[in-house]
């Protein structure tokens, strides 16, 4: 038989937060618009970043070198600033993208973590948040 010997593992006493899972974002629409929310994902509050958060489903293979794969769901702390080397969700030409952020010589480089892909170089970028976690289903 299994016996719980520590109250720390008692899930009934832990706070659950429902994090919005955002779907595809249409051009020109605010990413956080109600129609972009596909559902909610329950996470323990202690596993959450501080502040507001959301989740996005990853599409594509631009981040495979750091273990983020097509179909993964990333947990994102909502913020509009980033430091060099941060893994961010950025809005570029009305599309959300996950890349490593760098500010260089008056422009921004959004670096894919896939050796076969080129960076995105832009003069202006909107940071939606910093990636703080990942959820993956094994099929």
Map each language-model feature to its residues.
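Short, positionally conserved secondary-structure boundary motifs
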Residues: 1-65, 103, 107, 136-139
């Amino acid at each position: 038989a299994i016996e719980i010997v520590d109250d720390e593992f008692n899930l009934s006493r832990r706070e659950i937060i429902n994090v919005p899972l955002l779907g595809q974002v249409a051009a020109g629409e605010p990413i956080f618009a109600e129609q972009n929310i596909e559902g909610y994902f329950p996470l323990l509050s202690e596993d959450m970043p501080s502040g507001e958060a959301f989740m996005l489903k990853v599409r594509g293979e631009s981040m495979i070198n750091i273990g983020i794969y097509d179909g993964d769901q990333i947990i994102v702390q909502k913020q509009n600033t980033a430091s060099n080397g941060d893994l961010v969700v950025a809005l570029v030409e009305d599309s959300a993208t996950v890349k490593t952020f760098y500010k260089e010589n008056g422009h921004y480089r959004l670096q894919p973590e896939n050796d076969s892909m080129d960076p995105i170089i832009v003069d202006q970028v909107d940071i939606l948040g910093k990636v703080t976690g990942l959820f993956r289903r094994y099929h």
